[in-house]
């Protein structure tokens, strides 16, 4: 059994004296584990850092075996990612989300969004938007997709500013007004890719919304808590935006 693909390194752990078990999010084969012989060598360690874009070949005698990776660099991002808290927490958060998915299930859309996130860590607001969309996609891939395109009460497709915490469906301003305190906020950029978040508050409200549904449908049923990297990422984004506005 063998294949070749491109991927992004998510994590590495030692295996024996010289090898490493490497976790890669691949384009066509999902999140995949494999052993890299000599993975702890000085030559290989810089390559096997989270965030690096790699060419990966996998081989195993049987499909159910972990198998062996041969990994070659396509582009190095890890050194840049450890320079800022936004990037460091961001790649950790993306990896934590991907670990909610079954291993080896292909999710090309998530892979492509992961690549975009890594490319935009130098713009905290853009990185926040992309990771927010990543969480919306995660809910969809896990079977708990949100319906944000039209009002659950009226069918209107404009002025959608709320989300029902019960149904995960959008609600327009007029229909939601009597129950506004019980509804989740829906910033306009979330369901319109032509729009951008205008400030940190937009991101904070959007992440509160996705966090509610991740907790309800994913973390609590699995007896898990939100990863620390999530709050770390949001705090880092907030600080970075405040600093840029002050300068």
From Swiss-Prot:
InterPro entries in alphabetical order: ARFGAP/RecO, DNA_rep/recomb_RecO_N, NA-bd_OB-fold, RecO, RecO_C
Per its database record, what is this protein's job? Involved in DNA repair and RecF pathway recombination.
Q: Which residues form a coiled coil?
A: none
Which is a Pfam family this sequence falls into?
A: RecO_C
Tell me what this protein is called: DNA repair protein RecO
Concerning its family, UniProt says: Belongs to the RecO family.
Give the superkingdom in one word: Bacteria
Annotated keywords: DNA damage, DNA recombination, DNA repair
| Naturally occurring in which organism (per UniProt) | Brucella abortus (strain 2308)
Question: Do the record's keywords include DNA repair?
Answer: yes
One GO term of the biological process aspect: double-strand break repair
Q: Name one GO cellular component term.
A: bacterial nucleoid
Q: Does the keyword DNA repair apply?
A: yes
């Amino acid at each position: 059994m063998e294949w070749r693909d491109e991927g992004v390194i998510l994590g590495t752990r030692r295996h024996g004296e010289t090898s490493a078990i490497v976790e890669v999010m691949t384009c066509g084969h999902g999140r995949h584990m494999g052993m890299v012989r000599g993975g702890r060598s000085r030559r290989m360690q810089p390559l096997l850092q989270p965030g690096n874009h790699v060419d990966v070949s996998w081989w195993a005698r049987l499909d159910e075996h972990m198998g062996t990776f041969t990994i070659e660099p396509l582009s190095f991002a890890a050194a840049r990612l450890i320079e800022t808290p936004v990037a460091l927490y961001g790649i950790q958060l993306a990896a934590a989300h991907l670990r909610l998915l079954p291993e080896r299930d292909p999710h090309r859309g998530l892979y492509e969004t992961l690549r975009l996130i890594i490319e935009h860590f130098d713009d905290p607001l853009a990185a926040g938007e992309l990771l927010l969309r990543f969480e919306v996609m995660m809910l969809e891939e896990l079977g708990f997709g949100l319906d944000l395109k039209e009002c659950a009460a009226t069918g209107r497709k404009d002025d959608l500013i709320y989300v029902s915490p019960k149904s995960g469906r959008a609600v327009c301003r007029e229909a939601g007004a009597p129950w506004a305190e019980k509804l989740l906020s829906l910033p306009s950029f979330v369901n319109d890719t032509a729009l951008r978040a205008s400030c940190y508050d937009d991101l904070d409200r959007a992440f509160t919304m996705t966090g509610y549904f991740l907790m309800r449908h994913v973390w609590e049923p699995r007896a898990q808590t939100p990863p620390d990297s999530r709050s770390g990422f949001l705090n880092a984004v907030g600080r970075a935006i405040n600093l840029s506005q002050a300068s």
